[in-house]
Amino acid sequence: MQSFLKLLLSYRIAKMNTTIETEVNYLDQSVESSLYRNGKVYTFRDTDGNDSNWYGAKLTPQKVVINDAREKNHTIDANGFELINAPLLKENLDFLDLNDVVKNYYPQCEDILKKATHASEVYAFDHNIRWKSANEQQTQITDGQQIQQPIYVMHGDYTISSVEDRIYALGKPLGDNDTLKKFLEPGAALIPHNVISKIFDEKKRFSIINVWRNID
């Protein structure tokens, strides 16, 4: 599910006392910031969920030290991410079956986020599976999109402007690229009008939060 904030889910974690030094790709300082979507740095996604090339992006590797966050007590409010012990409610959940994921995992993700954030409304609306070897074999999710490659660059899924556009679009009839279109009535929206009104007219707070789970 699709960085403003990321909620990382972890279960049955083995104790690991490691610090890793590695290189991570960042946008070069010469590239104009696209925080507000300047139309100069972007990528496209087709209806199968495939990522295109990066446009306008000059990448520079930076050395970083990665610590084991499982030994810390990070929270969404203080750190922007949180590790949560959340075993699957359906043990035999098939992550390669779109119908199984939407019907049996989306509701669990919504419940996890409600408890973690105390939000009054939560809507799961999309997800990706990133799996290098399966992507190379062009593995397709049943009734869904193609499995994706990992993205080897630090990035945000939305800009400050595009995040509002995405929420607004979810309050309209869903389009061909929307995962949930086939699960709703024709012409239906995911987010009710009264919720959209609270966000844009009453200026209520909102965020898009990623839920990550290791499924290998």
Swiss-Prot record:
It comes from the Bacteria. InterPro entries: AsaB-like (IPR044053). GO terms for molecular function: oxidoreductase activity. This is Uncharacterized protein in dcmA 3'region. It comes from Methylophilus leisingeri (strain DSM 6813 / VKM B-2013 / DM11). The lineage of its organism: Bacteria, Pseudomonadati, Pseudomonadota, Betaproteobacteria, Nitrosomonadales.
